[in-house]
C-alpha cells in the first residue's frame, strides 16, 4: 500500500513538473487568445447582435397575431320610471367579458423593406469586422510572442556581454598587479562592468513587461515559449511587385470591405429616408366576442364581431421631417464616400510600406549576418593586440560591445522580418491561421 501510494505521488509529481516546464508554441498561445481575447470576443458579440437585429427587421414584414381580453363590472343606483307611473328607486348591476383576436400584416411599406436590406448588410459587415478582429489578433499575438523572445534574447546577450567584460576586468586587474597596464584600464573595465550589471537589471524587467503584455491578450501567464530556430531561419524576398499586392488588397482587404459596406448602407439610408414620402398599406383582421350578464336578466346577451380590412396611410405633410432626414442621409453618404477614399489611400500606403519593409529586412539580414562575423573577427584581433600592447582595454571593451550589439540587431531583425511578412499579408487581406502554422514549424522548444 505504501509503495502504491509512493508511486502515485511520484507519478503526480513528474506529471506536474512536466506540465510546468513544458514550453508553449505560437499556435498554442494563439488558440488560447482566440478563446480569451476581449477584443475578438467583443467583435463576435457585436456580430451576433447584428444578426439578431436582422431577424428583428424581418419580423416587421411577417404577420403579427395578438389576443386581448377585457372584463368589466357596472353597478348603478338611481330612480327609474316615467311620468305616468312615477319614479322608483332601484339598483342594477352587470358584468361584461370581451375577447379579441387580431391578425395584422404589412402589405406595402418601402421604409420597412429598406430597413430589412440595411439590417442584412450590417449583419454581413459585422461578420467582416469579426474576421478583421481575428486577423488583427494574429498580428498582435505574433507581436507579443516574439517580443517576449526578443527580450529574452536581449537578456541573454546582456548577460553574455557582462560575463565577457567580467573576464576582461579580471585579466586587467592581473595585468595591473604585475605592472603590465595602468590603473586607468582597471577603472575603465570596472565602469563597463557596472554598466553591464545595470543593463542586466533593465533587460530582466523588459522580459517581465513583455510577458505581461502577452498576458493581457491571452489572459494567461506564459512562463516558457518555444524559440525561433536560428539554424533553419531564412528570409525570402517577395516574388511579386508592390502593385500586384495593391491589386489583391483592393479585392480582399477586410478594412476596405467594411468601408465599402458602410458606403452601400449609407446609400440605402437615403432610400429609407425618402420612403417617408410614400404611402403604406396594411392588412388587419380581427374576431371578437362579447358576453354581458345583467342581474335579473333572463338571458346572457352575446355578440360576435368579425372585421377584415386594409389600412392605407398617405403622408401629406410631416413638418419637413422626412426631407430633413433625407438631407441628413445624403450628407452621411458623402462622409462615407470620403471614408472610402481615405481607406483606399491608407491601404495603399500600408501595402507599400509593408512591402518595402520586407524587402529591406531581407537585404538587411544578409548585411547583419556579415556584421556579426566581422565583429567577431574584430574582437579577436583587438584582444590579440591588447595582449602584445598595441591596443588598449578601451578598444577591447568597445569591440566587445560592438559584437553583442551586432548579435542583438541580427536577432531583432529576424523577429521584425516575420512580423513585417504578417503585416503585408494583413494589408492584402490574405492573413490566416495557416500563416501562423508555417511560422510555428520554424520554432524549437525553448
Question: Residues of each region from the PLM?
Answer:
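Small/polar (Gly/Ser/Thr/Ala-rich) solvent-exposed segments
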Residues: 41, 64-84, 89, 93, ...
Amino acid at each position: 500500500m505504501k509503495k502504491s501510494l509512493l508511486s502515485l505521488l511520484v507519478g503526480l509529481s513528474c506529471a506536474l513538473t512536466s506540465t510546468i516546464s513544458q514550453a508553449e508554441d505560437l499556435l498554442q498561445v494563439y488558440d488560447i487568445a482566440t478563446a480569451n481575447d476581449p477584443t475578438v470576443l467583443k467583435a463576435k458579440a457585436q456580430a451576433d447582435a447584428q444578426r439578431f437585429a436582422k431577424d428583428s427587421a424581418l419580423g416587421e414584414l411577417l404577420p403579427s397575431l395578438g389576443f386581448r381580453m377585457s372584463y368589466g363590472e357596472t353597478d348603478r343606483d338611481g330612480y327609474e320610471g316615467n311620468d305616468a307611473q312615477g319614479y322608483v328607486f332601484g339598483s342594477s348591476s352587470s358584468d361584461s367579458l370581451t375577447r379579441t383576436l387580431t391578425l395584422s400584416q404589412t402589405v406595402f411599406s418601402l421604409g420597412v423593406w429598406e430597413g430589412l436590406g440595411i439590417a442584412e448588410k450590417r449583419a454581413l459587415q459585422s461578420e467582416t469586422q469579426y474576421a478583421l478582429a481575428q486577423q488583427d489578433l494574429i498580428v498582435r499575438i505574433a507581436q507579443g510572442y516574439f517580443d517576449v523572445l526578443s527580450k529574452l534574447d536581449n537578456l541573454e546577450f546582456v548577460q553574455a556581454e557582462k560575463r565577457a567584460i567580467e573576464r576582461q576586468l579580471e585579466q586587467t586587474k592581473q595585468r595591473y598587479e604585475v605592472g603590465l597596464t595602468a590603473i586607468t584600464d582597471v577603472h575603465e573595465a570596472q565602469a563597463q562592468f557596472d554598466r553591464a550589471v545595470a543593463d542586466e537589471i533593465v533587460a530582466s524587467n523588459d522580459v517581465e513587461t513583455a510577458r505581461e503584455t502577452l498576458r493581457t491578450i491571452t489572459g494567461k501567464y506564459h512562463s516558457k515559449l518555444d524559440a525561433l530556430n536560428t539554424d533553419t531561419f531564412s528570409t525570402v524576398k517577395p516574388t511579386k511587385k508592390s502593385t500586384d499586392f495593391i491589386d489583391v488588397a483592393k479585392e480582399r482587404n477586410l478594412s476596405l470591405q467594411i468601408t465599402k459596406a458602410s458606403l452601400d448602407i449609407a446609400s440605402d439610408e437615403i432610400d429609407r429616408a425618402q420612403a417617408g414620402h410614400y404611402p403604406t398599406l396594411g392588412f388587419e383582421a380581427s374576431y371578437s366576442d362579447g358576453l354581458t350578464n345583467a342581474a335579473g336578466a333572463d338571458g346572457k346577451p352575446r355578440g360576435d364581431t368579425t372585421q377584415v380590412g386594409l389600412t392605407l396611410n398617405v403622408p401629406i405633410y410631416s413638418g419637413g421631417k422626412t426631407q430633413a432626414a433625407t438631407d441628413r442621409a445624403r450628407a452621411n453618404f458623402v462622409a462615407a464616400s470620403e471614408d472610402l477614399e481615405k481607406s483606399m489611400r491608407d491601404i495603399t500606403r500600408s501595402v507599400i510600406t509593408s512591402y518595402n519593409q520586407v524587402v529591406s529586412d531581407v537585404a538587411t539580414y544578409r548585411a547583419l549576418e556579415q556584421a556579426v562575423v566581422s565583429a567577431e573577427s574584430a574582437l579577436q584581433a583587438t584582444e590579440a593586440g591588447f595582449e602584445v600592447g598595441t591596443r588598449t582595454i578601451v578598444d577591447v571593451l568597445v569591440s566587445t560591445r560592438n559584437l553583442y550589439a551586432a548579435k542583438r540587431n541580427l536577432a531583432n531583425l529576424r523577429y521584425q522580418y516575420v512580423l513585417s511578412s504578417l503585416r503585408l499579408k494583413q494589408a492584402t487581406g490574405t492573413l490566416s491561421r495557416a500563416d501562423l502554422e508555417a511560422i510555428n514549424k520554424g520554432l524549437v522548444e525553448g
